[in-house]
Regions:
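Amphipathic alpha-helical segments used for helix-helix packing
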Residues: 86-114, 157-161, 301-324, 369-376
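C-terminal functional regions that serve as terminal interaction/effector modules
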Residues: 260, 274-275, 282, 286, ...
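Hydrophobic alpha-helical connector segments
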Residues: 51, 66-94, 281-306
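C-terminal peripheral helix-coil segments that are non-catalytic and often amphipathic
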Residues: 126-133, 157-223, 227, 231-232, ...
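N-terminal positioning helix adjacent to the helix-turn-helix/winged-helix DNA-binding module
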Residues: 1-2, 6-9, 144, 217-224, ...
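Amphipathic alpha-helical packing segments from all-alpha helical-bundle domains
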Residues: 110-136, 142-146, 173, 177, ...
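Helix-turn-helix
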Residues: 5, 13-47, 51, 228, ...
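Alpha-helical DNA-contacting segments of helix-turn-helix folds
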Residues: 50-56, 264-271, 314
Length: 404
């Protein structure tokens, strides 16, 4: 057994549970060895995780570097970005273990993770920031590069969730399909008319719903739950932490929640209901489909900007699987968005082949991603509406709807 054997097995074994557990005992059982046999190669679990980081970046950079050089040399801005997008989708479609590792271990912290990725790739001769030279305004946030990477991450997650188990591999036909689907979504978004999107009175729409997120009575107990989740994550947030934040005793909490799972479930169900409520209220301020969708997006963004602990809690379930029973997140958001004329019958398919129920989830994913990856040092509430407008234009018209 070599160090590389252990590293490869760790990607496979810990990835199955999305790194909820990184047990050396489980890893040793998978390899058919004792834990001391692993310790002969790695001093401790952190040393193994560090080696996994190096292996991931070595293999990832080696795969994309030839195509990165072609992208940098390309004169056409769109083609440059698409070369890299196709390459990254190709790599992650073929390497689910690497995808899961990057999603959770590298991007686990939205801001630190992005810096970590950039630094590691730079040391290996891949400077993705150089592609921003193709954008007209490199100070605009979010950048096209960020929105493209977020979109392919979302599509990859759905692809691997619906296509196959973690122990088999997608066919070449399905890999070509997912590359084409990602390219179409990035290029065209939802296919809205660019001129109509540009003609929207964004400031007027924003003023119509300004302040409405503060009209809903707060549930102080659930806010304490959200604060604990934001602080420690859903796996490590405890009833004791919630009791301390709420001023209640742990025994008193059991009169509100059956157990920790029920506590988390109530939190997420309540918050998704609130998000959908504000989205629906926002939509009612216009009868124009393009305006309605922007009102939905700005209403959801407003709510999350005003509730940072809720935003961070939702970000946890954006990247991690939680055993909370059936939470019909998509059905709630799906109805609000697909009721908008032209979105309920797009006929588009998701990576599993079903009709476009994934579009509302993609929209929420991009909203959360944009807020969580805001510029360093900026509070959630400080993210300007201009950033939400950039996000909206990308969603409805793709990069064709944004100025490069």
């Amino acid at each position: 057994m070599t160090k590389n054997d252990i590293i490869k097995a760790a990607f496979r074994v810990w990835g199955r549970e999305l790194y909820q557990s990184t047990s050396l005992t489980t890893l040793a059982r998978e390899l058919g060895v004792s834990k001391p046999a692993i310790y002969r190669h790695f001093q401790d679990k952190q040393a193994l995780l560090n080696a996994m980081h190096e292996t991931f970046f070595d293999e990832y950079a080696a795969f994309i570097k030839p195509w990165y050089e072609r992208a940098v040399a390309a004169q056409d801005a769109v083609e440059s970005l698409f070369i890299m997008m196709r390459t990254i989708v190709d790599y992650y479609a073929r390497n689910v273990d690497a995808f899961l590792f990057s999603l959770i271990q590298v991007y686990g912290d939205p801001i630190v993770g992005a810096r970590d990725m950039t630094a590691h790739l730079n040391r290996r001769g891949v400077d993705l920031s150089s592609l921003s030279r193709f954008e007209a305004d490199t100070q605009t946030y979010p950048s096209m590069v960020q929105l493209i990477l977020a979109t392919l991450t979302f599509i990859m997650a759905h692809f691997h969730k619906h296509e196959h188990t973690l122990d088999d591999h997608p066919s070449e036909e399905r890999i070509r399909y997912i590359i084409a689907l990602t390219e179409k979504k990035v290029a065209d978004g939802l296919g809205f008319n660019k001129e109509m999107v540009e003609a929207i009175d964004y400031e007027g729409l924003e003023n119509r719903i300004a302040g409405t997120v503060h009209d809903l009575e707060e549930d102080c107990l659930l806010r304490a739950v959200a604060g604990a989740v934001a602080e420690a994550g859903p796996w490590n947030a405890s009833m004791e932490m919630v009791a301390r934040r709420s001023g209640l005793s742990k025994s008193s909490l059991y009169s509100h929640f059956k157990n920790k799972q029920d506590m988390l479930r109530q939190l997420f169900l309540t918050e998704f209901d609130r998000i959908v409520r504000f989205a629906d209220l926002g939509k009612q301020h216009s009868t124009v489909p393009e305006e309605q969708l922007y009102l939905v997006i700005i209403a959801m963004a407003d709510y999350l900007r005003s509730r940072p602990e809720i935003l961070v809690a939702i970000d946890w379930i954006r990247t991690r699987r939680l055993d909370l029973g059936h939470i019909a997140v998509s059905s709630r958001i799906y109805q609000v968005i697909t009721d908008i004329q032209g979105l309920g019958s797009t006929g588009e398919q998701d990576p599993s082949g079903s009709v476009s129920a994934w579009i509302p989830q993609w929209i929420l994913f991009l909203i959360v991603n944009t807020l969580m990856r805001r510029p360093a040092g900026m509070a959630f509430s400080e993210l300007p509406n201009s950033s939400i407008r950039v996000l909206f234009k990308f969603i409805v018209s793709g990069i064709k709807g944004c100025t490069l």
